[in-house]
Amino acid sequence: MSTDHFADFAPNKTPFTSLIASRDGQNFTYESLHDRVPHILTDIINAYFTAIQDYDGPNKDQAVAEGKQITSELSKLKHEMVTDKPLTPLEDDGLGDTHVWNDWLQKFFPGGTWYTTPFLTWETYMYRRIAMIFKRSEHWNSFDFFFAKKEATFKASKVAVAKLCKRVDELTNECLGDIENTTKLHVAFIELLQASLWGNQTDLSMFPDLDSAKIEEMQARISSGENNAKIVSNDSEKIWEIVSTLSGGRVDIVLDNSGFELLQDVLLAHWLVKVGYAKHVVFHPKRVPWYVSDVTNEDFHWLTDSMRNPHF
């Protein structure tokens, strides 16, 4: 593909339909490929190295040997990334979409390298290839190399979690006590929806080094509502128009980040069911560990189990 189709990224000036690559040394996409994403990959390698050392399951010798091979493949991936090698085809790992990825890369970006392939393509390719490396293993195919970071981030959110749960409980009881008051229902829904939106601030693929103080600061802004004026495109009212017509229906929520944002999604679902707008809420997690903090099925159950545990 000719590089004429690509555009150098400038904040608020991205040409419509142009592809954004990472060639320019002064933009976010370049910084992502040069610093942010290699840092994430290094964190994966370090977390996995610790997991190998701590492994005490069956067939330990085989698992450790396999772990060393996986570490080598992850290091190879990082080397290819930072030295701008071509994106190589994925190997079959049983997930069923390998051919889709390979056909896409061959059709649109044949011979494309990390710095010449579009930003969104190479970053999603990286997470998919990491998943392939683990899925093709025997002992580590279900290992979540991001779990420890997701767990620590949620535990660091305990103050905001307590405030959020208390607030949702208050909103729910207020609405149930005056269920015919559509204005009250409307205001409560918008508050919950926008709180769920701002939970995205704890996206660990964008902020891999968040400490507990920064997390508390960001989550305090969510609780205060001061962020809402910064929403660039706000269709909350259109969503309310749809939700307000439901009566015991089904609502689907496509999950993004685990931990605090997931809890907000669950509490929004709780409110929708309690006040009668939904009878069923279906959550859609990711199939594999993705973009550091995205929700997997295991993350969902870990959070709900943790919230039930009085000693958590």
Regions found by a protein language model. Give the residues of each.
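Non-catalytic accessory regions outside enzyme or core folds
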Residues: 1-250
